[in-house]
Amino acid sequence: ALANAQPAALTLAPAPDTINYQLINTEAQLAELLTRLDAATAIGLDTETTSLDAMQAQLVGISMAFAPGDAVYIPLGHTLTAAPEQLDLDDVLGYLKPYLESDKLYKIGQNLKYDEHVLFNYGIKLNGISGDAMLASYIIESHLGHGLDELAERHLGLPTVSYESLCGKGAKQISFAAVAIEDATRYASEDADFALRIEAHLKQYMDTKQLEMYQQLELPVAEILFIMERNGVLIDKQELA
């Protein structure tokens, strides 16, 4: 049913006039970021980690986008070789926790359920999830791929910095924690920026029924799945016997 409801063609999202991806690795820069968060109503959000298994993943960094082309990256778990200067993870999370847990600051991302698990590993319950580019893509174009690389090509007309180009593949693949901080900043900032742009773009093409399905079914179900994955489910053994 979703595929039948897709629009005939989607135009590319407009490109921002400038691109500003900023590294946050000093206390002064962090203070400026907190001031920006105080004034923000919505952000693009992404986490960089050590594993695709969200339950086991450790934070390497957090990126946030405030507007198209405007994003920051906070390295938290890079190796000293990759990032000689970075802020203390516990200190940063302590400052960010009220914003991440606030339901008044809306968060948009790409498969945010993963990031929700990662942050929960550190005692942070991500609230205010209002958009997910992956789920928006499923509503509009269920027959196509929903990965961020594909979405960026399709809707922004842009190639992304691929994970493999930074970390390699196979036996020689390195951890994201070992990626040079300049490269990591661009990669992570792109993730938050592109997710923010793509989600807003796709939402413009949703009709009333699709928007209702997106906001009242897909996003709430993702939260239910998070709870189920986190806590497990009870099984009636007698009923199954």
Predicted segments, located by residue:
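Active-site-proximal helix-loop-helix substrate-binding element of RNase H-like nuclease domains
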Residues: 19, 60-207, 217, 221-225, ...
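Long, highly charged low-complexity segments
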Residues: 1-62, 76-99
